[in-house]
Amino acid sequence: MKKKTGILFLVLLIMALTVCMSGCSGSDALPQAAEDEIKLMIQLNLKEDIGLLILDNNLDGAETSGGISNADKSLLKHDDLLDWTLSKQEYENPADAVNLSVRFRVITEYCDPNYENDYPEEYTVLLDPISFEAEFGTTYHITITGDRENGYQAALDK
């Protein structure tokens, strides 16, 4: 009787662990764009941490600007994966496929974010823009590499 109870307990324990391991662990899937969004997944591959990342976007002639920073004022880690979304409702009747140009600005030291995206020149590094045809409902992957000494580069991953 004790042997059957022990086996039953072991089977139940294995089943519980299996369910927990498959259902309790979070999904490793990257966020996907909704049908009315263009999602940019920006992988930092830098030699040092940075203060902020500013994005100046031109979507079929409509210009917007924004930035990414940590709410706790800590630096963005050199290997962070950042998520940036362009929503269709922010633009006036865009087509499903648009010409998108993104110019990144790396702010090397933390500065308080501001609506004008105006930061000290000595901390600001302007990257060459990347341009491509983008479709709403699609996620694009961009990698930013480099360092303060040699400069930074942004590239659309294929």
Which residue ranges define each predicted feature?
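Bacterial N-terminal signal peptides that target proteins for export
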Residues: 1-10
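Short, low-complexity, Pro/Ser/Thr/Gly-rich segments in the mature regions of secreted, periplasmic
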Residues: 146-158
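Bacterial signal peptide processing site
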Residues: 25-27
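C-terminal motif of bacterial Sec signal peptides marking the signal peptidase cleavage site
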Residues: 19-23
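Structured interaction patches on ligand/partner-binding surfaces of diverse proteins
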Residues: 107-148
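Asparagine-centered strand-capping/turn motif at beta-strand->loop junctions
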Residues: 31-32, 38-51, 57
